């Protein structure tokens, strides 16, 4: 059975050479649709404004190449989470669309040197720069580092 990624792999491989530019997935849209989901609105507010725009940011521009993430598709990134002996802190905004992933990952961790921090009122991008509301819990991060990174 052929991989569902095969068409993208063939379409993107080798492109970017003198024959042409690589195909892209698309970043955050330049014009936000009226019915855009809340997480896309938050990304737009960050990546498409002076708050987070950068000409080389993949989310501010035209996104990743269609083949750049293929190597991660079958990577079991949490398969050995329960074997981590060192301190782990997971920080998510209360309103982050990705919060479920951090909470799921936290449940796999063992030991008493793990901490899950849910920042009240914060969304995903608020934790990039504070979101104008001091959302980054620097005091908690510092305390965790001092306790666990000796």
Q: Can you say where each PLM-predicted feature lies in the sequence?
A:
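Conserved alpha/beta-hydrolase "acid-adjacent" motif
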Residues: 73-76, 92-103, 109
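Alpha/beta-hydrolase-fold enzymes
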Residues: 1-49
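Short, conserved loop/helix-junction motifs that constitute active-site signature segments
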Residues: 81-85, 108-112
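Catalytic active-site module of serine/aspartate enzymes centered on a nucleophile-bearing elbow/loop
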Residues: 120-150
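Active-site nucleophile elbow and catalytic-triad environment of alpha/beta-hydrolase enzymes
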Residues: 62-80, 86
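Short beta-strand/loop motif that positions the catalytic acidic residue
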Residues: 84, 90-92
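Flexible internal linker/loop segments at domain or repeat junctions
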Residues: 48-67
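Catalytic histidine neighborhood in serine/cysteine hydrolases
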Residues: 109-125
């Amino acid at each position: 059975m052929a991989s569902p990624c095969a068409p993208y792999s063939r379409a993107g491989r080798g492109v970017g050479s003198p024959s042409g530019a690589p195909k892209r997935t698309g970043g955050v849209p330049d014009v936000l649709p009226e019915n855009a989901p809340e997480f896309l609105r938050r990304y737009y507010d960050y990546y498409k404004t002076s708050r987070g725009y950068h000409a080389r940011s993949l989310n501010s521009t035209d996104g990743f190449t269609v083949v750049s993430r293929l190597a991660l598709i079958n990577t079991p990134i949490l398969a050995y989470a329960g074997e981590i002996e060192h301190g782990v802190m997971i920080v998510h905004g209360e309103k982050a669309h990705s919060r479920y992933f951090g909470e799921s990952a936290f449940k796999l961790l063992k030991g008493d040197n793990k901490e899950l921090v849910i920042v009240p009122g914060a969304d995903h991008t608020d934790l990039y720069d504070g979101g104008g509301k001091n959302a980054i819990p620097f005091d908690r991060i510092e305390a965790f580092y001092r306790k666990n990174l000796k």
